[in-house]
Amino acid sequence: MYSFKNIEWGRLVLIAAILVYVVYFGMAYYTFTHMPPIPDEVVTKGGRILFTGDDIIQGKILAQKYGLLDYGSVLGFGGYFGIDYTSYTLAIIAKEAGWSPTLIQLKNASNNDEINRIREILAVSFDPQYTTLLEYTKGRVVVSDDFGRGFDAAVNYFTRFFGSKAESVGLKPNLITDNESVRKIVAFFTWTAMIALAGYTNGFPYMPGLVEPHLDVVQATWVTFLIFIIAVMIAAGYIMIKFIDLWREPRIRVDLPPPDDVQRLALLGMALAVLGLSIQGLLGGYVMHKYTDPETLYGIKGINSILPYNVARGLHYNLAVLWLVISWVSFSLFALPYLGVRISRRQAFLVLGAGVLTAVGILLGLWASYLRLIPDPYWFIIGSQGRPVISQGSLYLILIAVLAWYLSYLFYKASRIGPEVTRPFSKILSIALAGTGVGAFIGSLPITAPWPHFVVDEYFRWITIHAFVEGFWPPIVVTIMVLLLVLTGVVPPALGLAVAGLDAVLEIATGMIGTAHHYYWGGQPTMWLYVGAVFSTLEALPLGFLIAYSLILWRRGGLTNELQKTIVTFITVAGIGGGVGVIGFGAGLINMPIINYYIHGTQGTMVHAHLAMPLSYGVPTMLMWIVAFYLSGGFGDSWLRRFRYAIVVFAAGFYIQAFLSLMPLMIKQFSLVTSFGYWSIKGIETPWGGIGIWEMPDVKTFVGLRFIGDVIAAIAIAVFLIPMWLKLPKIVILKR
């Protein structure tokens, strides 16, 4: 009878990895031939040219150059604090046509007639309907004179916002003082508002009476429910039966010898990683403080000259990625000799050095780029691309790709010459690292300058993000965790391989194709709404099985030593804590189209990120530190017990942060967006200068409550940071 034991998981994982990239490059053809056009020029009925297609393209480039998308957002994509430039521009233009927030609060025939009149004034029509990758600018758009006056008002507003008011709203003082640059940036913002009015964004951003969700948004949500129920019924039954069968397979236990001096060098990278985690946590607190005090740091003025909000945010999320990556690179160097691949001292220093220098380059490059210390055109290459999350200079993404491919090669060698029991796991790791490298390289494109069209940029940006956090990173983490369970005798090798292989196939397939849920509102074709709704929800399947598997491990017991108990504890915290963060507040909730429509780019995304990243990825990575230090003689059994308590406290800190602060803020934003529109949920002021959401008393209270969870998580981090640095000099030998 054919069973999981007969499956060549490495081959299936490779097929999945190749298939998802083939699918995405195939679908790119349809997407890039059905993009909203960038008009050659936009003119008023009176004959005045407002802006040209080149202005729109240059405005997008300038927005990236000044780091504006790490402060505010465009069509909801970008920062969670600063204003949404699309909805603010739309609101300012609509106000010139007679729209106001109070107009939509009163439901009567007179108001409906007025709203219809405003719709006619703001109507936008593109001819031709679509443009292509080979011809971005096409056609001429004629708008009303009221629209033209609204554009002028928006230019005046953003001239003050990015100029004289910049420091007071959390940006570098007088960030943009060139009026022509501001006009081009506003041309880009206005174009995004125009494609929303013309129906290219499935009715986003919500503007009551003017821009509202399309029927496809509701239909795609119902399709999600149907597919998810069918998939769960079929997959859950089959997988659980097979897992029960494999549970009876014989277990092994491998007593690993103490690491040699070269392996111990990897602990240097881990020590730097825990330091990076600590700094990232401090920056997270600083960023949240800016929500309610954007101009100063507890009264200290001038801070925005060296660490404005967009710089701090960029450093914060980059450190979240970098401490993980440096840890994985270090653990690879530590583990590869056990898997059959000899690492020389020179190799170890070169790989670690390349990783650390790349990380430092990313951080310094972003800081210098957003503060305008790097001249044109080099900011895109060695500074920051200015794209949210994928903000790393293109050179650094290429270096990350090369490093990932080199490690992939080493694990491929391990899959050929290593111990029989570890070979299939090494093969999965090799494929996952290769896929990560491809994703990083895609993120570096077009290498020397930004993509001219927003839709093209978003298409490739999200492929890179999902290649990391949703597609190829889960197989890296899960495979390492399962391999630790196998080698310590907790689970049978056959079951461990089935878990790692099945998870890798499902994560890569659903996670990569599930990228489509980021194509709901950005101007991509409507078909992505259905693809994203289905596949992003199916992302919950492998995570759901991992939660169940974690519970089974914990319930089964039979753990005989402290290392086994520590591994299972960390995996349980990661599986349950992180899995719930992904399923409850990610694939299973906020990715459903009708829900995502109202909370896209809100603190709801922060709930998802602040539970999924530190718990699903952070906790297993911290386990890698502990295992490496334990095998090196740095920690004994008593320390393992302390770390088990610390990791539970660490997870508790993030859940307290989410439930006391981030979730109430999400609910507040949901209430505001459904009442007034998307413009109302970000910013410290309204488009017409009134008090914004971050100035509301209840919102300030919720922001302050995050401090409790931050402190609890910080205490737990200190339990790892201090002993790791104290033990490091005793176990790492730098010289022969």
Question: Whereabouts are the PLM-identified features?
Answer:
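Cytosolic-side transmembrane helix boundary signature
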Residues: 1-12
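Perimembrane loop-to-helix junctions flanking transmembrane segments
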Residues: 43-47, 295-311, 598-601
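Membrane-interfacial, low-structure loops and terminal tails that flank and connect transmembrane helices
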Residues: 3, 247-265, 556-564, 734-736
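Juxtamembrane inter-helical linkers in multi-pass membrane proteins
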Residues: 94, 248-256, 299-302, 424-427
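Soluble extramembrane regions of membrane proteins in the secretory/endomembrane system
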Residues: 26, 33-218
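Aromatic/His-enriched, Gly/Pro-containing loop or helix-boundary segments
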Residues: 44-57, 66, 89-124, 309-313, ...
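Hydrophobic cores of alpha-helical transmembrane segments in multi-pass integral membrane proteins
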Residues: 10-30, 59, 63, 75, ...
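Membrane-interface segments at the starts/ends of alpha-helical transmembrane spans
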Residues: 210-223, 304-314, 382-392, 456, ...
